[in-house]
Amino acid sequence: MENKGWILVKDKFWDSYETNRLTEEFQKQDIEIQLVNPNDIDIFVNKENKSSILVNGEPSDAPRFVFPRTGSGTTYYIKAVIRHFERMGVPVINSSDAIDNVKDKLYSHQILAQSNLDIPNTMLLKHPIDIDFVNDYIGFPAIVKTISGSYGRGVFLAETRKQFKQLLSMA
């Protein structure tokens, strides 16, 4: 199999700094990289694993590896494409399980804590939110994160109880 990998990335991120840097580093290792929008991939399941990938409607050989870079925009369809590569035995850098794990911020913290890594005190809040309870267990200032979001979206700093209460009123 030739030294070729695919970076799965949506068109709008093809020219991003991160994508360009990854491509440069792969090229330094003499690895040919193809940027592929995962939404341009069609898959079908067969027992031979041959020609079960189409890109823009054309049969395609499987790459040597796949590097998903789809972030919080990873849909069920994109995860199905990633799982298809896994089933075919194609190494996937950032497996479908890893993608599921990082999409859930609380679960990510639980995994890190289980691995004895230092993490900030973290709690899942339910409504109605008891500000005294938060103050007793976390304190202020506190970082407040929404359940989903990436690239810094959905992350807020509440330096005081008052700011925390204001954040809650916006939710």
Question: What residues fall within each predicted segment?
Answer:
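Active-site nucleotide/adenylate-binding loops and adjacent lid/helix of ATP-dependent enzymes
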Residues: E2-V9, T19, S60-D61, F85-G89, ...
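Conserved N-proximal alpha/beta basic substrate-recognition cap immediately N-terminal to
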Residues: D11-N121
